[in-house]
Amino acid sequence: VLSSDDKCNVKAVWCKVAGHLEEYGAEALERMFCAYPQTKIYFPHFDLSHGSAQIRAHGKKVFAALHEAVNHIDDLPGALCRLSELHAHSLRVDPVNFKFLAQCVLVVVAIHHPGSLTPEVHASLDKFLCAVSSVLTSKYR
C-alpha cells in the first residue's frame, strides 16, 4: 500500500520524468531487452536495434501508461484496467516481465535524475512500480 509520503515522492520525481516519456521509455525497453533477452519474444515484429522507431514508439506508450498511473495514483486498478486485460488475455505476457521492466525504469530514472532519487524516493517509486505490476497481473487470476 502506498502511503501519502510515497504518493508525494512518486509525483515529485515523475514531474522530472514527464517531459521525457519517449526517450526514457525507449531506454527502459532497450535495457530490458539487453538484461532480460527472453523478453524479446513478445516483440518478434519489432526492429530491436538501438533507437529504432518501434522501440521509441512503444517506450512512449509504456511511459505514457505510467504517467496515467501517476495521475490516478489513488485508483491504479481503474487507470490500468484496459492494459491489464490486454496483457493478460490478448498478449499473454508472462507476469515476471513487468518486474523486469520496473527494474529498468528505476535504473533509467536513477541515471537521469540521480539527485532526485534519494533512498526514500527510490523506495516509493519501487513500491509504486510494484503496485502497477500487481494491477497489470490482476486479470491473470
From Swiss-Prot:
Reply yes or no: does the keyword Metal-binding apply: yes
Q: Where is the Globin domain?
A: 1-141
Which parts of the sequence bind O2? H58
The answer to whether keyword Transport applies is yes
Q: Which CDD domains match?
A: Hb-alpha-like
> Which tissues is this chain's protein expressed in?
Red blood cells.
GO annotation (BP), single: hydrogen peroxide catabolic process
Residues that bind heme b:
H87
Q: Which GO terms describe its molecular function?
A: haptoglobin binding; heme binding; iron ion binding; organic acid binding; oxygen binding; oxygen carrier activity; peroxidase activity
What's one GO-annotated cellular component? hemoglobin complex
What are the record keywords, sorted? Heme, Iron, Metal-binding, Oxygen transport, Transport
PANTHER family, alphabetized: HEMOGLOBIN FAMILY MEMBER (PTHR11442), HEMOGLOBIN SUBUNIT ALPHA (PTHR11442:SF48)
The record's note on quaternary structure and interaction partners says: Heterotetramer of two alpha chains and two beta chains.
Give the UniProt family note: Belongs to the globin family.
Its biological function?
Involved in oxygen transport from the lung to the various peripheral tissues. Has antimicrobial activity against B.subtilis ATCC 6633. Has antioxidant activity.
* Name assigned to this protein: Hemoglobin subunit alpha
Supply the source organism for this entry: Crocodylus siamensis (Siamese crocodile)
Q: Which gene encodes it?
A: HBA
